[in-house]
Amino acid sequence: VELADRGGFDIDDDDYAKVVEQIITDEIGQGEGANLVVGRRYRAVVADWSAEKALTVFRRLLEREHGAYWTFLFFTGDRYLVGASPERHVSVHGGEVRMNPISGTFRLPKHVAAPDGAPAPDLKRDLLSFLADEKEIYELFMVVDEELKMMCDICHEGGQVLGPFLKPMSHLVHTEYLLAGRTRSDVREVLRDTMYAATVTGSPVENACRLIKEYEPHGRGYYGAALAILGRDPEGEPVLDSPIVIRTADVAPDGRLTVTAGATLVRDSDPAYEVAETHAKAGGILS
């Protein structure tokens, strides 16, 4: 699969860094939200795009992108969504509800192992430093708090928090929690009442969505939305399984490709670091 036009981000690195600075100063710093996920779009054109090319990309993701919750290829009728999402949005099996908020992001070096197979000498040190970083810790706490509120709304006994855990991917390592509870609600109501995840919007969610509209120049399309499988288990009980649509290429039939990548901004965010994070997230699907 080759690109006829390699394209680039709709907001360049310098301008995105300025947006990050503005949000930290004018919004988060003034109490308009605890954190905000602001995205930018990488646009390119795939040469001779077809259903066969879509299947090729899907196969490569299955082979190369380890740790995904869902690896998928979905055709809407007018565009292809092909991706490897690390994050479960929500699942329901036998009345058991699960959500997996993911936030902290550690970028793996290109060479994670030495020639003899031992870990790269700086990897352990850098990973431990990442795990002790207060900015990364608070970033995850904020989204867990917001999604736990959702769990309390849909689960009659409230929710349980398990973790934190590491979520290793091919290019990144994330930190995540597992939220668990029981519900009597219809699975369709569960899906509706958990939209949209704080991990792709911010918190509080309603205010974050208002700020996203203000700071992102275009609508998000399918980015941050949810795919879902709904059905029944062998006992006839309703089931739901839904990932968040991130790390996904949105490709039109003529080959126009869009990959949206966002960074979670908090008071202590470093603009240059957030710029690099969007490159790493987009790179997982573009490589």
List the predicted regions and their residue ranges.
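Conserved hydrophobic core element of enzyme catalytic domains
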Residues: 178-287
